[in-house]
Amino acid sequence: MVVKRSGVMVLPGMGAGDASTIAIRTALASQGYRVHRWNLGRNVPTPELQSALRSRFFDVAERYDEPVALVGWSLGGLYAHRLAEFAPNMVRSVITLGSPLNDGKQLPSLSVPTTSIYSRNDRVVSWARSLVDDRQPRHENVEVRSTHLTLGIDPSVMVVISDRLRRDPDRWKPFRTPPLMGA
C-alpha cells in the first residue's frame, strides 16, 4: 500500500546546516513530500541547540494531522532517534544516514519504523556504530556504497529513503535492494 505524501523533516550532520541537505530535500519535494529543513543554522551540539531543535520539531509536527518522518544525516540521525524516543506519537519513521547510533551499547529501540543507512566506506563514522538492532520489529540496516560526505547526494541512498518513506508504517517490510543497486 502506498501512503499519501506526508511531512518530512531533514536534519544535517555536525558542523553542517541546511545547505548540506538540499539534494535530499529537493529530491523528496519533487516526489510530493512536504519537506522541512531544520532551520537552526550550523549543527553545533549544545544544550541550547537541543532545546531549539525540540521546539522546531514540535512546530513542524503540529502542522500535520499525522506523524512526520525524520531523516537525519550523521549527528542529525542521532537527534532524529532522540526526538522519536521523546515523542513517538509525533514521528512516523526515522531514517538515519551514517549516524553514530551506538558505541558498543545500542540506543533504545524505537516504536516507529527505523532504517539505518550505512557504508563500510564511511571513513567518518565507523559503519558498525551506525547499526540499529535489526532483531527489533521494524528496524533495519541498509548498506550502500558511499562515503560519509556523499551520503546526502548518493542516488542509492535516495532510492532507500524514497522507498522507506513510501511505505505505510503499519504494513512495514524490510527494504529489498533493487538488482542494479547492489550493496
Region roles according to the model:
Residues 4-19, 23, 27-119:
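Serine-dependent carboxylesterase/thioesterase catalytic core
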Residues 110-183:
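C-terminal catalytic-base region of ester-bond hydrolases, centering on the histidine
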